[in-house]
Amino acid sequence: MVTIRLTRGGAKKRPFYQIVVADSRSPRDGRFIERIGFFNPLAAGQAERLRLDVAKVDAWVAKGADLSDRVASLVKEARKAA
């Protein structure tokens, strides 16, 4: 099964997440199919907090991909901002 989920990057105590399409059996930070955005929870000032290609999300969901709970809320936020 294919899922759209977050992979963690960044330094210790300074998380930065990539939003990726991955097989649900692969490790959290392992192999992925496509990178479709990023999420920076600690963005300050003019830094971009969320960038997400909503068209690609819609395309993958149409193909049967599931969204993780957190990604579903981020997609909702991205649609509201656009």
From Swiss-Prot:
GO cellular component terms, A-Z: cytoplasm; small ribosomal subunit
Keywords tagged on the record: Ribonucleoprotein, Ribosomal protein
Pfam families assigned: Ribosomal_S16 (PF00886)
Keyword Ribonucleoprotein: yes
Lineage top rank: taxon: Bacteria
Keyword check for Ribosomal protein: yes
Single GO biological process annotation from the record: translation
GO terms of molecular function: structural constituent of ribosome
HAMAP family, per database record: Ribosomal_bS16 (MF_00385)
Family stated for the protein in its record: Belongs to the bacterial ribosomal protein bS16 family.
Protein name: Small ribosomal subunit protein bS16
The organism of origin for this protein: Actinobacillus pleuropneumoniae serotype 5b (strain L20)
Gene this protein is translated from: rpsP
